Amino acid sequence: MTLRIETALADIKIATPCLVLDREQIAKNYKNFCHKMKDIDIFYAVKANPHPDVLSLLVSENAYFDCASFQEITLVLAAGSHPSNICFGSTLKKASDIADAYKVGVRYFTFDAKEELQKISDHAPGSSVCCRIITNDFGTGAQWPLNRKFGCDEDMAVDLMSEAGDLGLIPSGISFHVGSQQTEPTAWQAPIAQLSRIFRQLAELGIALDTINIGGGFPTTFGDDAVPDIFTYAKVIKAALNVHFGDKKPRVIAEPGRALVGDAGIIVSEVVLVAQKSSNDSQRWVYLDVGRFHGLAETEGEAIRYRLTVPERQDSATTPAIIAGPTCDSVDTLYEHNPVEMPVALKSGDIVLVHDTGAYTATYSSVGFNGLSPLRVCLVEDVNQMKFPKLQAI
């Protein structure tokens, strides 16, 4: 949570919806992560928040970058990073994007299928490659599992990495992902064991890998849902690495996104309407000017439960309310099965803060669904530029 944002918003009303970011909190999170994960190289997952000021900050901290597209690579390079600090980490890349990345100097690519490996060979010759595997625990403990769409099994990983050299590529490492917002530190144990088996099998074939990629998934705190400290994750991960690799550990990299930027943002929204469906209905619906199509996509299935506060009505009595977005799509309902406590006195025009929204919000925002503008983003020091006078009733 960032008090700087709440303090900055206390005396002004800004144009909504708007995501306000605190770079000081991001810098603090990054330094803490590096300290707790000592000897592990940090590749920021750009997809979490690719705002230019976020990227330039992390460049100044000497971070590495995990990019999901050539467009993200372009943003990172524009922020001042060197192509040698970039991994093209998506396993789904057009041949033209691989070629474009290679042209600007990127030499590290991830894959999980034979055809993808061939594309890298054709368009990025001589590059280092990392094969992503499926974890055996199927994303248990994650709020947002990622295990079905990506990765291959252990046997295929061995076969593909065995072919990489013959294709003119450098077989470098194996990666996995335990799922986003992973609240179980032990989730990394089994995949690290899987990696050790693959390393041994390839070593027997004369192929020495040099990198372990333990992926992302490191969580941030949402509301009252406490998560383990990063140090707890570090202890479990390093213990597993010691068990399975001993003193012969290769380079280890991690790809945090949410853990670095999640708690560094607050979406400022406005109540559009408070309604009931009949005169006898006690259930309120609260419609905000931000919803599933404006950055809150991770409320899908109510997986991520953001904390909502109403600064002007902190002392008001509350009752549960269904929370929905502003569009003409019924899917744009955020919390219906588990309504949120909202002030009884809440009315249209009230400001609602959606906390811990620094990750996976603005990048999810639609370009113009229902004609509504994408979610605006500003830095906390620039909120004065986003303000507007309160409307006066006629």
Which residue ranges define each predicted feature?
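Short glycine-rich, flexible loops that bind phosphorylated cofactors or substrates
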Residues: 118, 138, 361
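General structural feature for long, well-ordered alpha-helical segments within catalytic domains
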Residues: 22-25, 29, 50-54, 72, ...
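A charged N-terminal "starter" segment
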Residues: 1-127, 166, 170, 204, ...
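Structural preference for beta-strand elements that scaffold enzyme active sites
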Residues: 41-43, 64, 83-87, 108, ...
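Active-site loop/helix belt of alpha/beta enzymes
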Residues: 135-275, 370-372
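Charged (often Lys/Glu-rich) extended helix/loop segments that serve as interaction or gating elements
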Residues: 5, 236, 247-394
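Short, glycine/charged-enriched secondary-structure capping and boundary segments
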Residues: 57-58, 80-82, 102-103, 123-126, ...
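Active-site beta-loop-alpha junctions enriched in small/polar residues
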Residues: 24, 45-51, 68-72, 91-93, ...
